Amino acid sequence: MGPTAAGKSDLGIELALALGGEVVNADSMQLYRGMDIGTAKVPLEQRRGVPHHLLDVWDVTRAADVASFQADARRVIDGLLAVGRTPVLVGGSGLYLRAALDDLTFPGTDPAVRARWERELASRGAPALHGELARLAPRAAAAILPTNGRRIVRALEVVELTGTFEATLPEHRSVYDVVQIGIDRTDLDERIVERVERMWGAGFPDEVRRLAEMGLREGRTASRALGYAQLLAWFDGAMDSAEEAKQATITATRRFARRQRSWFRRDERIVWLDQPDVTQVLRLVGSL
């Protein structure tokens, strides 16, 4: 686990080979079918024969659902453990990793309630709905920016369905025996630039065009993914050039990496490395 562009995917494959394991994806955007270049999904021919689970399971029009991912991930993990294989979870989506590994439960959803609040969002705007949330659940409102319409709508939905909203996650409590390895690097900013340049060189704009024809704009989650959102903005005339979209992607990715660092650093169970060194990780696994 760790911020984007740190080298997690290659290390995951090395660990799976060394431990007799299989990779379980915990990157929320790699769940989406066809989102390959922009999410740095490892191509099949580079996986070195290691099975990868929970890649390409959702259409781009589907909204992200962490509770559904939790059920799928635990089914895969339990299945691997039952046959003596080691699950190697790889990803930078902190909530998804916690959902798979920790004792977390998630409130249900109601499409009708969600749709009603989304209509309210469209007509009244995020700040007005944030005021409504502050009246109903002040702690929840304090944890959500007034401009984050998606999170405000979800919080209002939960409050309506359950009568409450817990704004913070519970204490870290694993449901499996887990060794958590975090990868962070001092050269991360440079690696992000290199990754985005490779994405453009590999035909990323064409990938986004294809996905736009498949309904990417209608996908509440996929359309907001790093790079995809910026290219859609260029296609729709909100940016002047592909170069502007590229630079905006670099800026947004660096900002996202800082948020990832902040999230993961709160978890004292994670052992941090500054390089993806499989030998060092195997020593850590053997010592615990």
UniProtKB/Swiss-Prot annotation:
Its cofactor is Mg(2+). Residues 27-30 are annotated as: Interaction with substrate tRNA. Catalyzes the transfer of a dimethylallyl group onto the adenine at position 37 in tRNAs that read codons beginning with uridine, leading to the formation of N6-(dimethylallyl)adenosine (i(6)A). One of its GO terms (molecular function) is ATP binding. Keywords: ATP-binding, Magnesium, Nucleotide-binding, Transferase, tRNA processing. Its EC number is 2.5.1.75. The record marks 93, 114 as: Interaction with substrate tRNA. Belongs to the IPP transferase family. ATP binds at residues 2-9. Substrate binds at residues 4-9. Monomer. InterPro entries: Dimethylallyltransferase (IPR039657), IPT (IPR018022), P-loop_NTPase (IPR027417). It comes from the Bacteria. This is tRNA dimethylallyltransferase. It catalyses: adenosine(37) in tRNA + dimethylallyl diphosphate = N(6)-dimethylallyladenosine(37) in tRNA + diphosphate. GO terms for biological process: tRNA modification. Disulfide bonds: none annotated.
